[in-house]
């Protein structure tokens, strides 16, 4: 896989994204995060969402697709794009789609429904843990 390094340790396979490891990453979204692009870009407000999310298999893809279908337009800035073209980058459903330079689920700072991940915001709205709603790569 281009851009990734995989290390097998018995039954466990560790997968590292080289660009992410070279980035200016700081892990508090919306609080001065420099983002994960090759150059610091806090003004974009993308945090770690610039590349979308690589999904951990078919089960996670099905879960994300099902949860996306429950998101209301007032809480999901790119609801129209998702309705028209789906939330996945392609037919393999292995990653989320990019819209305007970031993950389709990223509500931008100006969005009236709340900035940040639409899945994260929706989980909090119903009293559930965001980790149960988001792709695993987004919180591990």
Predicted ranges, named:
Residues 1-140:
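Hydrophobic scaffolds flanking metal-cofactor catalytic centers in soluble metalloenzymes
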């Amino acid at each position: 896989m281009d851009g990734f390094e995989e290390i097998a340790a018995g039954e466990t396979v560790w997968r590292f994204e080289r660009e992410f490891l070279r980035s200016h990453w700081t892990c508090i979204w919306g609080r001065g995060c420099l983002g994960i692009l090759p150059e610091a870009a806090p003004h974009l407000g993308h945090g770690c969402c610039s590349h979308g999310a690589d999904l951990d298999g078919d089960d996670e893809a099905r879960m994300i697709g099902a949860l996306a279908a429950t998101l209301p337009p007032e809480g999901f800035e790119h609801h129209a794009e998702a309705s028209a073209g789906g939330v996945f980058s392609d037919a393999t459903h292995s990653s989320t789609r990019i819209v305007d330079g970031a993950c389709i689920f990223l509500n931008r700072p100006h969005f009236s429904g709340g900035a940040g991940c639409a899945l994260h915001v929706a989980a909090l709205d119903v009293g559930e843990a965001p980790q149960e709603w988001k792709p695993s790569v987004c919180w591990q």
